[in-house]
Amino acid sequence: MATSSSSSSSLLLPNINFNSRQSPTITRSVSIAGIFLPRNRLSYNHNLRIRTRLIRASKDDNVAVEDRDNAVKINGDYNGSARLNGNGSARKSVNGDFNGSARLNGNGSLVKYVNGSVTVETEEVTKKRKEEVRKKRVEDIGQEDAWFKNNTQQKQVEVSVTPGGRWNRFKTYSTIQRTLEIWGFVVQFIFRTWLSNKKFSYKGGMTEEKKVLRRKVLAKWLKENILRLGPTFIKIGQQFSTRVDILPQEYVDQLSELQDQVPPFPSATALSIVEEELGGSVEDIFDRFDYEPIAAASLGQVHRARLKGQEVVLKVQRPGLKDLFDIDLKNLRVIAEYLQKVDPKSDGAKRDWVAIYDECASVLYQEIDYTKEAANSELFANNFKDLEYVKVPSIYWEYTTPQVLTMEYVPGIKINKIQALDQLGVDRKRLGRYAVESYLEQILSHGFFHADPHPGNIAVDDVNGGRLIFYDFGMMGSISPNIREGLLEAFYGVYEKDPDKVLQAMVQMGVLVPTGDLTAVRRTALFFLNSFEERLAAQRKEKEEIAAAEELGFKKPLSKEEKQEKKKQRLAAIGEDLLAIAADQPFRFPATFTFVVRAFSVLDGIGKGLDPRFDITEIAKPYALELLRFREAGVEVVVKDLRKRWDRQSQAFYNLFRQADRVEKLAVVIERLEQGDLKLRVRALESERAFQRVAAVQKTVGSAVAAGSLVNLATILYLNSIKTPATIAYTVCAFFSLQVLIGIIKVKKFDQREKLITGTA
């Protein structure tokens, strides 16, 4: 009678070793989930070892079962057959040195047998294999992203200078040399830009085609020198790569190549950094480590590896970045302080360049600490854990340090690769909507958003019909509660057409500085609020007319003259108020807003690339309606409104008892006016503009007279062989000549602004 013993555990990948007198040792792999039932058919002796944790093992009288260290060893005599039964159905014969057959029943499916090796997949293994196949497909479609690999079918960025240049070896030269290198680049760029706008620099006359060609050449030169200067300037170039409102399209096209097409640094250096940071050799830590990087960015590069059976990627930081940032940011602060003095622009916005610099410097220093990036990644993933269309790679904290970041390998296709997305079979229109919705969630709901959303940091795979994959969380933005509340209040003010509420919200956010007289600002806000709905209706009507015209086979867009006329009409209505705003400069531009505006400008460009009819306002409309419903139904909002109303009523009740005093004060003011003791100051904007222009002209004329006198004096001295004083006189003459040139430009700007304000431009 047979006796049996059993034990429960989970069955992993066992190895079966057959040793017999008739054949050498052969290793066969079996993956099952079930019951092992050996039968004793004596033919020759062999040993059977299953390296696994057994679910249940049964034995006959003549078979010994030993369970030790997750291994089951069965010794006995077999007549060429064994039977493995489980919770499924799979049967296959085994051909090999072991003469017999095996029946394998598992809760999966039998895949194959080769020379006595049988593989049975469980549901978990099958799911894992399918996921690997899916990832491999995404890799094959998006393989062009590894632009720096030697592939003749891919278009690579042409960089004539040595990528990495001296900044990769900056410890070998001094801070002074680096500073001279930076300012040499700045001076060259200013001179080249100035020269490209001068007629005498064009052979055969200046034409628009020649100017475009010159801008393309200069833009390529700018990109190559930014690459040569290194990570700090690459980051700045990335910031401007989407600002089509500042730079011509030729510059934007070249700077966009800085977004993720940055040359990698030597892999040997990356390998040494990984081993130093993780405290061991890559052979001991990883099952596999790919020597060649799969991507490179301004601050580091990415290598694939296999860790404990899982595919991972390692983000390795470029060496010596902090010392390089210390040098570069000192020079950039000088530039920011200069811009703080020469700005504001004529739009009335006085940008706080020093604050923007401080914010950027803080972000750069945070980006070179990968532990902070890992924390940002986990916070971001937690915010979107309930959304199926957003994926964030998981972090392996045990293998993450300030210079090495280890995370889950999640392949994807860049969101601006239209042909690859079509080949993947995802809905591009839906992807554009998802991108905007995800950012609205980040800003309005969480107040924590990805501040660098260029196409290199947003990818797509085919999960759930198209899923957004976010990478690189080193550059994140946070919106404080008062700014978020101010944004909502401004939105409600626009909806209710209440200029006072809009201005109050702008003051709360720090965008508007309350000056002594906000009358011009209020009138301008009221004008835009009143015309907002009319302009939206006109735009909708214009779109309908254009669509109808296209259906009939012709299109009649507005001519350039008609657009200019509409612009003149708008300026004529509020021109004086805009000029007063420009003079008072009540607006400020918080540093956080630069990242928000940049993010939505990037998303708008991405969306229009995915869908020609992309309209960001249509996507944001449901969120606006939801905010309005919350405004109407939210308990907290109702309580807040009641509190505000109570404060206003309390103030009104208090003022009721002060009316007599105010009437008395008004009578005193009128009496002083009648007696001539009170001066009334009236602001005449036309006179102010005229005086400013006259002052500029007078200064220019004075500089011209001084330059003329000095050039005569220097010439006389030189002719009389008095060379040293002549040289000094020529130098001072050059200074006054430069002042004359600046004065002429300033007078021209005054004239242009006058024409723009009066609508005669």
UniProtKB/Swiss-Prot annotation:
InterPro entries: ABC1_dom, Kinase-like_dom_sf, UbiB_kinase. Mostly expressed in leaves and flowers, and, to a lower extent, in stems, siliques and roots. Residues 288-648 form the Protein kinase domain. GO terms for molecular function: ATP binding; protein serine kinase activity; protein serine/threonine kinase activity. It is found in: Plastid, Chloroplast envelope; Plastid, Chloroplast membrane. CDD domains: ABC1_ADCK3-like. Induction: By cadmium ions Cd(2+). Progressively repressed in senescent leaves. Levels follow a circadian rhythm, with lower levels during the night. Down-regulated in response to iron deprivation. It comes from the Eukaryota. Its EC number is 2.7.11.1. GO terms for biological process: cellular response to oxidative stress; circadian rhythm; leaf senescence; membrane lipid biosynthetic process; regulation of response to reactive oxygen species; response to cadmium ion; response to high light intensity; response to hydrogen peroxide. Residues 1-57 form a transit peptide. One of its GO terms (cellular component) is chloroplast. Pfam families: ABC1. It catalyses: L-seryl-[protein] + ATP = O-phospho-L-seryl-[protein] + ADP + H(+); L-threonyl-[protein] + ATP = O-phospho-L-threonyl-[protein] + ADP + H(+). The active site is at residue 452. ATP binds at residues 294-302, 315. Keywords: ATP-binding, Cadmium resistance, Chloroplast, Kinase, Lipid metabolism, Membrane, Nucleotide-binding, Plastid, Stress response, Transferase, Transit peptide, Transmembrane, Transmembrane helix. It is a single-pass membrane protein. Disruption phenotype: Increased sensitivity toward oxidative stress (e.g. hydrogen peroxide H(2)O(2)), high light and cadmium ions Cd(2+). Higher superoxide dismutase activities in chloroplast and disturbed expression of genes involved in the antioxidant pathway. Pale green plants. The pale green double mutant atsia1 atosa1 accumulates ferritin and superoxides, exhibits an increased nonphotochemical quenching (NPQ), and have a reduced tolerance to reactive oxygen species (ROS). The chain crosses the membrane at residues 725-745. Involved in resistance to oxidative stress (e.g. hydrogen peroxide H(2)O(2)), high light and heavy metals (e.g. cadmium ions Cd(2+)). Influences responses to reactive oxygen species (ROS) production. Together with SIA1, regulates iron distribution within the chloroplast and mediates the oxidative stress response. Together with ABC1K7, influences chloroplast lipid synthesis/accumulation and modulates chloroplast membrane composition in response to stress. Belongs to the protein kinase superfamily. ADCK protein kinase family. This is Protein ACTIVITY OF BC1 COMPLEX KINASE 8, chloroplastic.
